[in-house]
Amino acid sequence: MSGIKRTASSNRWMLEHFDDHYVKLAQKMGLRSRAAFKLEEIQQKDQLIRPGMTVVDLGAAPGGWSQVAVKLAGDRGKVIACDILPMDPIVGVDFLQGDFREDKVLQALLTRVGDAKVDVVLSDMAPNMSGSDSVDQPRAMYLVELALDMCHQVLAPNGCFAVKVFQGEGFDEYMKAVKAVFKVVKTRKPDSSRARSREVYLVATGYKL
């Protein structure tokens, strides 16, 4: 390991992470990640999840969003989560580990959803970042396209969709695609999202197809 040097950007990320107010608060509150606060802020503004709803959480690990979703959906609700990474169990969450880009994983996820329609699709998916926009942005846009396709397959009429998108090439076209199938689409930048990050969240309500 002595021959491996950390880059300035990775060192900066480590310093930011461990000095981050939301990281410390998440640890104090027993939340799995600081990302939980992003969904909580979106929920406060847009009221996406209500008791009894069925929610699909894509890119769920380590479980911050699933923790929030299962609390909001309550005992009568259902949360189905998926991630390529492992996730420790959460009471009330049906977790599938697998690569959402693979058809066999999609089919397994659809099997868990069953015949009932889903009320909310959440996606906090992001690719492993290489540091090259020309590589990272297409990968990120591919994931959000898959998340929108999931909406087309499982979302109930008037259902909701919240998805992390990185601003850059393909963003405007994706926004148009989301607006074409939802009645209202808002762009959110939660306070808990790092200011220098290009990530925003599209919050779409009133699914039309």
Swiss-Prot record:
Q: Under which name does UniProt file this protein?
A: Ribosomal RNA large subunit methyltransferase E
Tell me which EC number(s) this protein carries: 2.1.1.166
- Specify which residues bind S-adenosyl-L-methionine according to the UniProt entry for this protein: G63, W65, D83, D99, D124
Q: What NCBIfam families does the record point to?
A: PRK11188.1
Q: What is its main location?
A: cytoplasm
A single GO molecular-function term is: rRNA (uridine-2'-O-)-methyltransferase activity
The protein's job, in short, is: Specifically methylates the uridine in position 2552 of 23S rRNA at the 2'-O position of the ribose in the fully assembled 50S ribosomal subunit.
Cell compartment(s), UniProt: Cytoplasm
InterPro entries for the chain: RNA_methyltr_RlmE, RNA_MeTrfase_FtsJ_dom, rRNA-MeTfrase_E, SAM-dependent_MTases_sf
Domain of life of the source: Bacteria
What is an example of a Pfam family matching this protein? FtsJ
Q: Which UniProt keywords apply?
A: Cytoplasm, Methyltransferase, rRNA processing, S-adenosyl-L-methionine, Transferase
Annotated catalytic residues: K164 (proton acceptor)
Under catalytic activity, the entry for this protein gives: uridine(2552) in 23S rRNA + S-adenosyl-L-methionine = 2'-O-methyluridine(2552) in 23S rRNA + S-adenosyl-L-homocysteine + H(+)
Cellular component annotations (GO), alphabetically ordered: cytoplasm
Organism name: Shewanella baltica (strain OS155 / ATCC BAA-1091)
Family statement: Belongs to the class I-like SAM-binding methyltransferase superfamily. RNA methyltransferase RlmE family.
The gene behind this protein is rlmE
Q: Which Gene3D superfamilies match?
A: Vaccinia Virus protein VP39
